[in-house]
Amino acid sequence: MTGLTVALDAMGGDFGPQVIVPAAVQALLQYPELKIKLYGDHSAITAQLSLLNQHSYSRISIIHSDLVIADETRPSHALRRSQGTSMRMALDAVSDGEADACVSAGNTGALMALSRYTLKQLPGVDRPALVSAIPTHGLNKTWLLDLGANVSCDADTLFQFAVMGSVLAEQSLTSKPRVALLNIGEEEIKGNDLVKRCAEMLSNSPDIHYIGYIEGDQLYAGKADVIVCDGFVGNVSLKTSEGVANLFINSFKQTISTNPMKRLLAKWLFRDLFVSLKKLNPDQYNGASLLGLRGIVVKSHGRADTAAFANAIGEAVHEVKRQIPTKISDRLEEVLLERHY
């Protein structure tokens, strides 16, 4: 691929251009083929650019918008009043072929609703799913979905999530990703009817390497490459994990910060631990993809800092280069055809 363009909702998140503009410049330095379109308040964006001594401005376009979808806006209201907002304009750029992907740290519900409205779902996809990588004990990562796009699902939808997650994992990890269903136990008799029905469907699909159920305490064990659940369970699991990780990291920092000698000894004695703690930092995995659409949309944490938002841009670049929507569409067509026979 000779070049690609990512549209950024520059006004989304807790910090807006203060974080997103430096993150855009950081991404441009990392990806020479990348161009950025910034949608938002022109004066606020240029003010941030003026603070940065970089030479990549020729690859940045600013499209002015003084309208922002507030965090408290309901998705239904956002659909009716989205014209001219920074989020809608960034999504329209993807829909109109002016950009290859969109990244936003704005209102999650509004982003999902507007993404479905502007980009539409791929054939064979009932509902898009939010997916993100999570760390494991090993060198690889695990993809967890759904993370909140659908608080309730049927078995067919969970099956589609498994297919989409497998395609994404194949492009990053292995040619035959291990797929598991998140459940309250590993035994076949455990779980509700929804999970059992999906397990049966996955077991009968030759295109999916289904390994069975996995419990919550094994999320980070590296036993599966893709873990599937509904959005309610996935969101609670992820937020709980992030809270525990932050508690551990902050407690450790607080302990060693009280004494200079402790800090010195910690850096010397616990170098490997510092590497492990960095791996647990949720910012390293910022950027949840909305899979199942005809275009690429990545959701960043609203509280993301510059490095974290740059990671979200990197995820968008990764998916564009690997043509994830096209590969998901092709795989779903194959799987659905086999199920009909």
From Swiss-Prot:
Keyword Lyase: no
Subcellular location(s) per record: Cytoplasm
Keyword annotations from UniProtKB, A to Z: Cytoplasm, Lipid biosynthesis, Lipid metabolism, Phospholipid biosynthesis, Phospholipid metabolism, Transferase
One cellular component (GO) term of this entry: cytoplasm
One of the record's GO molecular function terms: phosphate:acyl-[acyl carrier protein] acyltransferase activity
Catalytic activity: a fatty acyl-[ACP] + phosphate = an acyl phosphate + holo-[ACP]
Enzyme Commission code: 2.3.1.274
Transmembrane segments annotated in the record for this chain: none
InterPro entries, alphabetized: FA_synthesis, Phospholipid_synth_PlsX-like
Pfam families assigned to the protein according to its UniProt record, in alphabetical order: FA_synthesis
Annotated metabolic or biological route of this protein: Lipid metabolism; phospholipid metabolism
Biological process annotations from GO: fatty acid biosynthetic process; phospholipid biosynthetic process
Enzyme class: transferase
Subcellular location, principal: cytoplasm
Signal peptide positions (record): none
Quaternary context: Homodimer. Probably interacts with PlsY.
Biological role stated in the UniProt entry: Catalyzes the reversible formation of acyl-phosphate (acyl-PO(4)) from acyl-[acyl-carrier-protein] (acyl-ACP). This enzyme utilizes acyl-ACP as fatty acyl donor, but not acyl-CoA.
Protein family according to the UniProt entry: Belongs to the PlsX family.
Protein name: Phosphate acyltransferase
Gene: plsX
